[in-house]
Structure formats: C-alpha cells, structure tokens
C-alpha cells in the first residue's frame, strides 16, 4: 500500500466532507448557547442558595426553640411570645434600612421587577431576604419558604444577567429561571418549579422560556438531591376515590376553598392597611406583630403542647393527611393560622404564603372531610384525602395557578391515587375565585401599588416600565407656606410653571399653589402682606409614589388639571421627593423607547 499519497487523499476527502451543507449547521445558535449556559449557571446558584437557606432556617430554629427556650424553662409558655418578638426586632430594621422589597411574601416583588424594571433586582436582596425570612420563619412567623426562595433565586438570576450585560428579555428569563430553580430545590419539585415560573411570573409558555426554565429547575433539583438526598416533603397514606358520587363532594369543597382563598387574600391586605394606621416606627411593627403572634401560639400550645400555628407547619399538615386531627382541631387551626399569617405579614414580616396556603387548605379539607365522613361513613374517604385535595384547591384559589397547584402537590407527596378529585377541586376553586376576584393574592398586591400587569405579555407596555422615580424632576422649585406672594410671583416668572408644590417646614407636602390665584390677587392689587398659605387652593392634591408607573401620573394630571403631580415618600409622611409634569413623562418615555430599540438591535446582532 502506498502511504506516500495518504496526506493528499485525506485532504481530498476532507474538502469533500466540508463541502456538505450539514457541516455548516450548528446544533446551537449563539442565542441558544447563551441561554443554555446562563440558565445552567442560574440553576446551580439557585440550588446552592436554596440548600443554604433551608439550613440557615434549621440552625436558627434550633437556636431559638432549643437553646434560648431552654434558658426560659421557668417562664413556659411565655417564651412563645418572647421569641417571635425577638425575631421581629431583627426583621424590622433589617428590611426597613437595607432592602424594603424584602418585606412581605416576595413573589409580587419579583413580578414587579419583571414588569417595571426589566427583571433588574438589587443584589443586596439576596442577603437581606435570606436573613429576614429565615429569622422570621425560625422565630415562629407564620409564613413559608416558597416566596423567599423564589425572590432569592430570582435575584441571583438577575445578577447573572446584569453582570453579563444581557438584554431585558434575557434578564427576565433568567429571573424566572432563578425562581424555578429555587422552588424546585426547596420542594423537590422540578416540574412544578418550572411551571410556577412560566404560569405565575412570566405568564407565558413559549418554547424558548420553557427550555431555559426547565434546565435551571432540573439543575437546582440535582444540587439539592446531592446535599440533602431524595425525600418527599409529605408522606401520605394510600387514598383512592371510594365512589364516583364523591366527586360532587370534592366539587363543593373546591367552591368552599375558593371563597376561603379570596377571604384570606382580602384579610391579608386589610391587615396591612390596619398596621399602616398604627403610629409607631416602621421597624418596630414586627415586634408588636410577634407579640400578638405569640398569644395565638399559646392558644394552639394549650391544645396539645405544641404551637402548631408557628412556622411552616408541615408536621401538622402531615398529621392531617393521616387523619390524626379531630374536627375541632382542624377547624380551630384553620382560624388560628389565618390570623397568624395575616398578623405576621401585615405587621411587616418576611416570608411566603405558599406554606400557610397549604396549611389552611389541609385544615379546610380536613374539616370538610370529617363532616362528610360523619354523614356518609360508607362511601366517603377518610378526612386525610380531603385534606390532601384541599391543599391544592386552596392554593389554586389563592394564586390563580391551577397547573402549578396540581403539579406541586403531586411532586411533594408522590401520590397519584386521587388525581381526578385533585384536578377537579383545584380547577373549580380557581374558576370560582377568579369570578369572585379578578386578582390573585400576588396581583392584588401589585394593583394596590398601582402596578397593572400588561395583558399583552409579548410586548410589555413601555409606560408601565417607567416609574415615577425614574422620570421625576428632583430639582423642582418647592415653596414654603410662609413665603410672601411678591416672592412667589418672582418664582413663577423664573420657572414658567403654572403650579408649584407647597411644603411645610419639615419638607412634607402641604398642597399646590397655582398662578391663577396669584393673578387674581395681582389684578386686585392685594399681594402685599399676604403669604402662600392665604391662597393655597389645592390642599390635598393627588400624589404618586416613587415605585408607581408614570401612567398613573398622566391620569392624575387629567383629573387634577393643575400641571404637576407631586412624588412623595412611601413612608406615609408625604415628604416631597420631586414632581412630575407632562414634559418629564414624555422625556422618560422617549428614553425607554430608545433603550428598547437598542436592546432589540443587540439581540439581532447576537
């Protein structure tokens, strides 16, 4: 064989092979490669974050209810009041001074960042939310891990996107990836974690988003398995549908779960409103909430020696699944948990609503099951079956997320025996709750802030993404109440404005003064010896908060007709931060259009 011609032969064949069209194809284009790698990184980060967060809660819980409570044995059960109050003493200042978006249950804050800020979340949220929520849960706060880990994972995804200087659309996707990974790792539920991110956060099921989110969820779940092993959140006995007639009972329970879910949502925000009226410093409110929570804990402690309304309450849920709780206990714990959760979050605590929703759903279902079983003992399954279905039905009604509710219960329990009643009750609950209230517990919080989620999720409204803080004029000419009208006339002449904000000595907004009133007095020749306070025409003007979208200011301008809308602090003090005029809104809108065009151009290049 002549080997001397081998190099030429190889070269000839290589040229022929390289000429084939398929060699010019790529398995992944640049965009897909970027999303694959970044979603993998976010999955690793959120998985590790979820493991650390869970271990931090366990460590703090042991510190609080073993070490500290052990030192207070002679004061039992007063330690149930002191420990939640101590937790509140840490949570309040931590949230108020370092990251106020860490207050509450977390998911609405993520949705707000996706809608208003292109998914950009401050890096400090990772640390503050981790500490605040772990302290709150460990000290007895009636909240869950789902909201915090969703926000923590989302913040990690946002950080990755910002560091790599990705476009807004990609940052949003990575935020959803982080949330999916956090939930998957926390609850051993990768499918539900991915669906939660798509159904609740992104509100769309596009193939591009689905692939990235699933990669993050699976990666995070693998990380959690490596450190903590493969274990179900809840153990359940074997349940089955005893009779087709039971489906009618499950349908009725789904309706009741929907009404209870809507009631919970409204009571939660009613509690927030009531706490906002209490005139004490904001950082101290969680202390008061902790004291009141402790009183509820003592009530539940008297039943069987355990404060079942504290924390996530998974042990109590599992007891209800095995039908180990009496009718009186399930009904009593339903009411106590409702009060405990609204107290914790209303007073400024930090934690999610998923675990409390499962708890209340289990207690509602257990109560319904006890009653149904006592009436139809031969044909109705034990109360534990109704508790299991009630968990999904209640959360579906609260979050308006039936697919997530069904899947997460499957993955947390591993029980597929009563799939029909579970799906039926959850869908019925979601339909009824949507008819009673158009907003879920997440979107209602945003609506109260003036944030309306875009109906067309494929093209997010640019005006929705521009906040008052981004657009406002901070260097506005604010005038004092005691300013002489002659001086006010000079101020109007130099600024060419038709209305100016009036402030008190402490910089709080007193109202608006317009040039119309000043012109009337000038024509009458009575400007001398009079002050702004004498002609203050608009004493209670419509205002806007820094985090609210500027389209709200446009609406106020139309209603008020005074030419400017004051921007005031969120603390309730009405401290003037700036003003919004039509020209400010137009400038900010033009800037947003330009940035969106640059992002689209950047995507086309990649």
What name fits each language-model region?
Residues 1-465, 469-470, 474-475, 479-491, ...:
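Alpha-helical transmembrane segments and immediately membrane-proximal extracytoplasmic
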Residues 1-12, 570-571, 599-606:
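Short, intrinsically disordered terminal tails adjacent to the first/last structured region
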Residues 407, 510-518, 577-585:
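Short hydrophobic beta-strand motif reused across regulatory alpha/beta modules
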Residues 466, 483, 513, 530, ...:
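Short beta-to-alpha loop/turn elements within the nucleotide-binding domains of ABC transporters
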Residues 469, 528-533:
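Acidic/proline- and glycine-rich, intrinsically disordered low-complexity segments
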Residues 479-496, 503-504, 522-525, 543-570, ...:
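The conserved cystathionine-beta-synthase
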Residues 505-508, 571-575:
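Flexible loop/coil segments at beta-strand boundaries within sensory signal-transduction domains
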Residues 532-542, 597-606:
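Short, solvent-exposed cationic patches
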């Amino acid at each position: 064989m002549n080997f001397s011609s081998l190099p030429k032969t190889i070269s000839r064949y290589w040229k022929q092979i390289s000429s084939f069209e398929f060699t010019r194809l790529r398995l992944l284009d640049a965009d897909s490669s970027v999303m694959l790698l970044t979603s993998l990184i976010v999955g690793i980060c959120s998985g590790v974050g979820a493991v650390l967060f869970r271990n931090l809660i366990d460590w703090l819980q042991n510190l609080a209810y073993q070490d500290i409570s052990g030192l207070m044995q002679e004061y039992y059960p007063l330690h149930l009041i002191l420990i939640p109050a101590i937790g509140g003493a840490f949570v309040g200042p931590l949230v108020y001074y370092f990251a106020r978006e860490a207050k509450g249950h977390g998911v609405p804050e993520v949705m707000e960042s996706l809608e208003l800020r292109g998914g950009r979340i401050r890096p400090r949220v990772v640390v503050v939310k981790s500490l605040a929520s772990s302290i709150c849960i460990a000290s007895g706060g009636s909240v869950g891990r789902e909201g915090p880990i969703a926000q923590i994972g989302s913040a990690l995804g946002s950080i990755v996107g910002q560091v790599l200087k990705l476009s807004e659309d990609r940052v949003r996707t990575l935020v959803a990836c982080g949330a999916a990974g956090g939930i998957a790792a926390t609850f051993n539920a990768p499918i539900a974690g991915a669906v939660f991110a798509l159904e609740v956060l992104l509100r769309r099921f596009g193939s591009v988003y689905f692939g990235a989110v699933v990669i993050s969820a699976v990666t995070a779940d693998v990380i959690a398995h490596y450190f903590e092993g493969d274990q179900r959140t809840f153990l359940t006995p074997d349940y089955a549908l005893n009779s087709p007639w039971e489906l009618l009972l499950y349908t009725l329970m789904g309706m009741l779960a929907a009404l209870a879910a809507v009631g919970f949502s409204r009571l939660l925000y009613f509690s927030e409103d009531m706490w906002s009226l209490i005139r004490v410093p904001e950082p101290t409110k969680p202390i008061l909430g902790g004291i009141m929570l402790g009183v509820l804990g003592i009530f539940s402690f008297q039943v069987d020696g355990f404060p079942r309304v504290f924390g996530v309450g998974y042990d109590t849920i599992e007891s209800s699944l095995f039908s180990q709780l009496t009718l009186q206990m399930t009904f009593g714990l339903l009411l106590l948990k409702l009060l405990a959760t609204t107290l914790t979050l209303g007073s400024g605590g930090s934690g999610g609503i998923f675990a409390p929703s499962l708890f209340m759903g289990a207690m509602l279902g257990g109560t319904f099951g006890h009653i149904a079983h006592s009436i139809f003992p031969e044909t109705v399954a034990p109360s534990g079956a109704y508790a299991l279905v009630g968990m999904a039905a209640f959360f579906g009604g609260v979050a308006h997320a039936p697919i997530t509710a069904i899947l997460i219960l499957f993955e947390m329990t591993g029980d597929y025996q009563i799939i029909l009643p579970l799906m039926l009750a959850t869908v019925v609950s979601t339909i009824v709750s949507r008819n009673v209230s158009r907003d879920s517990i997440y979107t209602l919080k945003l609506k109260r802030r003036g944030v309306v989620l875009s109906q067309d999720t494929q093209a997010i409204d640019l005006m929705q993404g521009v906040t008052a803080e981004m657009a406002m004029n901070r260097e506005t000419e604010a005038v004092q109440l005691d300013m002489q009208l002659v001086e006010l006339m000079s101020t109007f002449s130099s600024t060419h404005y038709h209305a100016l904000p009036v402030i008190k000595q402490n910089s709080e907004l007193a109202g608006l003064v317009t040039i119309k009133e000043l012109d009337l007095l000038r024509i009458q020749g009575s400007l001398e010896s009079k002050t702004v306070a004498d002609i203050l025409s608009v004493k209670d003007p419509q205002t806007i908060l820094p985090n609210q979208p500027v389209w709200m200011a446009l609406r106020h301008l139309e209603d008020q007709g005074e030419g400017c809308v004051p921007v005031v602090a969120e603390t309730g003090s009405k401290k003037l931060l700036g003003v919004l005029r039509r020209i400010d809104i137009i400038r900010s809108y033009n800037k947003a259009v330009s940035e969106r065009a640059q992002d689209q151009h950047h995507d086309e290049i990649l």
